[in-house]
Amino acid sequence: MTKIPKYWTVAKKYLSKKDKVLSNLIKKYNSPSETVLTSRKDVFYSLCKSIIGQQISVAAANSVFLKFKKKCKNKINIKVVNKLNIIQLKSCGLSRQKAKGIKSLAKQTLNKTFNPKLIPRMSDEEAIIYLSQLRQIGRWSAEMILLFTYNRSNIWPVQDIGLLRAISKNYKKKYLPPKSFVDYLKNKHSPYCSVAVW
């Protein structure tokens, strides 16, 4: 894991001034043991984990991921994963579609049709579109990669159930909160939406 993003402290001060609700939440959770956004900076690892975790419980995802990690002999990298076949991947508990997604990811990364090194130079939207071209990776998954792997400062995943529930709870709105209000908060919290989401 890496250090906290450089923008973290500035973002908290900015959001505290802009939004009374967030100001109260930041004060509530502001402590030496505060959990902050960090990253392992390994996009291939993160994409594999993202594909594995789709549409299953956290417990199930963790179980499958541990089996996958063991199958990779604790070395989740492109060359190791590329040597695994679909049957080996399925034996970890992966569906055929997810196994194909991970195989495709390894192949595309090896032949450079997918090049993660290009992403830091892209805008958020360009990066989302680029990542979404990968098999088994949709917009929400791409946003999670930008948030948790690249630590982009202004990600606002409007399809995220956790975010929508948090908005409903903290801003006293019905669930689902109106799109107009979600968009209003995005504009209000920009350019530090990622910190607001966290």
Model-derived segments and spans:
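N-terminal polyanion-binding entry modules of DNA glycosylases/AP lyases
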Residues: M1-M122, Y184-W198
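Amphipathic alpha-helical segments within well-ordered protein domains
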Residues: C48-K49, G53, I86-K90, I128, ...
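Alpha-helix capping at helix-to-loop junctions
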Residues: N74, K107-N115, Q133-Q136, L147, ...
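A short, terminal or domain-edge coil/loop segment
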Residues: L94-R96, I129-R139, Y171-P177, S194-A196
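Catalytic DNA-binding helix-loop module of base-excision-repair DNA glycosylases/AP lyases
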Residues: S123-S168
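C-terminal end-helix/capping segment
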Residues: D160-Y175, S180-N187
